[in-house]
């Protein structure tokens, strides 16, 4: 898959080591209960993720950038914590990863760690068409989607600790909507910024910010866009639709 991306013309590939997906389930002590060479100590839990990185590097060569998204915390009891996350970053750095992105949370246990702002359960119930799934969301949604108030640069403290430990480049993610936040992140030595919801609100974020020093993105972190991930029309910003209709 990585080789296909390179041959298709992409500039880099990102390996997902976080959010509760496959490689993350090996890294996290919450989900990795193995008793063989792939479970137990952090070195064992990192065995498969490091093999994945090695395989991708072998496929794309030394000149194609490989990024890795790691979790600073799983946000759940018994899960990954910042101290181990820093060691994960150091292992990936030593293995030759080109850049790291520090996120957090898990899709199945506590996704609001990386979303922040309004919770997703009400919006997911609204767009769900399966009556059984809709009922399930109503019952478990409030427990699964805990409320974490939005604040700018909510992963900055943990990302700094990783930055100070590794030699690879660093990509900041997490609450970077205001231009002041963008400036702060770059001044602190991060090499790139990864944007999600601000680009859903305004795909021309970068060009508009460059042209207007007083630019405001307009994302209010309602997370309604995220609840549309399974909707027939795909993900979009409902605020933009409402603004056009008014």
Segments from the language model and where they lie:
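Flavin-dependent oxidoreductase catalytic cores
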Residues: 1-246
């Amino acid at each position: 898959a990585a080789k296909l991306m390179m041959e298709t013309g992409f500039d880099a590939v990102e390996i997902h080591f976080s959010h509760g997906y496959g490689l993350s389930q090996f890294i996290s002590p919450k989900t990795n209960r193995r008793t063989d060479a792939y479970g137990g100590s952090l070195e064992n839990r990192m065995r498969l993720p490091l093999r994945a990185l090695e395989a991708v590097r072998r496929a794309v060569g030394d000149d194609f950038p490989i990024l890795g998204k790691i979790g600073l915390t799983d946000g759940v009891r018994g899960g990954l914590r910042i101290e181990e996350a820093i060691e994960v970053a150091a292992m990936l750095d030593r293995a030759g990863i080109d850049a790291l992105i520090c996120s957090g949370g898990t899709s199945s246990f506590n996704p609001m760690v990386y979303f922040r702002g309004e919770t997703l359960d009400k919006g997911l119930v609204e767009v769900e068409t399966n009556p059984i799934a809709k009922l399930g969301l109503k019952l478990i949604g409030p427990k699964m989607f805990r409320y974490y108030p939005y604040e700018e640069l909510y992963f900055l403290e943990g990302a700094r600790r990783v930055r100070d430990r590794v030699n690879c480049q660093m990509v900041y993610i997490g609450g970077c909507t205001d231009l002041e936040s963008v400036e702060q992140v770059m001044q602190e030595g991060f090499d790139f910024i990864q944007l999600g919801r601000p680009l859903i609100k305004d795909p021309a974020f970068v060009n508009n910010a460059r042209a207007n020093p007083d630019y405001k993105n307009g994302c209010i972190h309602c997370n309604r866009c995220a609840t549309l991930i399974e909707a027939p029309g795909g993900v979009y910003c409902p605020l933009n639709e409402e603004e056009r209709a008014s």
